[in-house]
Amino acid sequence: MTLRNIPLIGMLSAVLLTVQVGLAFLPNVELISLLIIIYTLILNKKTIYIIITFVLLQGLLYGFGLWWVNYLYVWFVLAIITRIFKKETSPISWALISGFYGLSFGALCSIPYFFIGLSNGTLESGFNTAFAYWINGIPFDLVHGISNFFIALVLFKPIYKLLDYLYKKFNIVQ
């Protein structure tokens, strides 16, 4: 990481926060997933710093509640998935990955509830608590998955091309 990367990380984190706040009035419709996919494809490991900054900004803006614990890992899961499929070039592939990620978001976010349920003393209680949380959010996960799919299908290529162009134009060092 170079000194030159710090403003880049700050700006791209601010973009994540801005689009999140800007679309907050639409439940589970977001550009964060698509942007993290594109950031990971182009910026590789720098995305880690962008995610950390974004998550800290979210906590400062909205408070450090239980929802925030989810953010400590869910966006990193998406970055890891992106790294696994980094050879994919088709917008439809990324739309499917983004859509599936949106569908699974509630399941990923149910993990802390498993541990809360464990505090009642049994493994079954942990699973029941996490399962109840996940089932309760399925309508939101459906919206999240469908909107992620269409957002990525339409915007993946233009945003990827723009960020890749800027990355090369300003000779941002790996």
State what each model feature region is.
Residues 1-42, 46-53:
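Hydrophobic transmembrane alpha-helices
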Residues 1-3, 84-95:
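Membrane-interface helix-boundary motifs at transmembrane edges
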Residues 17-30, 53-88:
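Interfacial aromatic-anchored transmembrane helix boundaries in multi-pass membrane proteins
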Residues 33, 47-51, 55, 140, ...:
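Pore-lining transmembrane helices
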Residues 36-43, 76-84, 102-103:
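Alpha-helical transmembrane segments and their membrane-interface exit regions
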Residues 41-44, 81-89, 157-164:
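Structural signal for the C-terminal ends of transmembrane alpha-helices
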